[in-house]
Amino acid sequence: MPSGLNDRGFHLTLSLPTVGRQLLTGLLWLCLLSGCAEPDTGPDQLTEYLERLERVTGVSIPPHTPFPSALDLPRVTVPTPPESNQIDLIDFLLLSGCELQVNLGRRNTQLGRTASPSQRLLLDLEFIQLVPACSALLRERGNPELATTLELASKGHQQILPISIANAILLGPEWEAFWERPKALALYPANTSSQIIAALSQLTALSSRWLATRSLADDWAAGNRKFELLLSELRAGDGGALVMAYSIVARDISRATAMLISMNETAPLCPFGQETERSKAFDNIVSRFFVGDIQPWLVALRQRKELLLAPVNQLERPLRDAMPEQYAQWTDERDQLLSRHTAVIKKHISAIQIALSGCARS
């Protein structure tokens, strides 16, 4: 009797006892055979579904709610502690013959003082990498005091490295662009690729290596161009589109569910236990618009979430303690939205089942 709605990660059973059951079964087989190809107008299909439900249920569509501001990435930064063990001009001149002198020179230029967080991070990494060789040279020259000053400065940079990495990656303009909401979802998620997944994974690998090998100078090497290119790829990421899509789904499916609950309480489809023309129309709307159009899009969104969120969490997790509280609150809001998708759909399916449960075939 029942036909099944399958989404990876959960199984939902939708009982449609009228003639539309055959159409539903056919649509499900089509979905399986075609790989559940993503529709290109998910939000529009949700709107059409709501409008058709309004006509058949006689219940007005609940008010439209705006996108929650709590789901927008907060614009915050983590202040970097001031450097101790400063190198003065005389010490700088004594570094002749050390590659580190070039690094310090770049830091003290106008460009160095106004460098982006990502460029400052690369300068810090280079500084840490170059200190051991320069320190050894200074000790050979009989200047252990300056060597010790450099070593202490290097340790200071290492201690604040989580903050430096967080400012460069998770609080930088590229990450902000990654989570920026698009004006419209258009073909999303059919218009995405695996390139952003690869970029996130590579950034995570770099960050993890920098954090895990603090005592190994040879492991600090960072290709400036590679790092900046990876950051630039974040600008084309679809984090904002994913959150926007899930917010729309949660809002509109919840609105549809509220309409069905109201109908079931005040004007059931089959008040005398037999199917009606109204129940048949409702059956057709669910089969055609929810199962045939919306459900494949929901499956595609879930698949994209699983692909995207895993590397995002891997990148964020080691840096969480270095992030401001506002960012932690935002990630909680974001992840709660993305995780309650299944519950929202299940509740809607349950409302559909209840609506048709008293409609025996005549």
Residues covered by each model-derived region:
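A cross-kingdom marker for long, charged
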Residues: 39-64, 233-362
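Extended, low-hydrophobicity segments enriched in charged/polar residues
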Residues: 155-261
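Sec-dependent N-terminal signal peptides
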Residues: 25-31
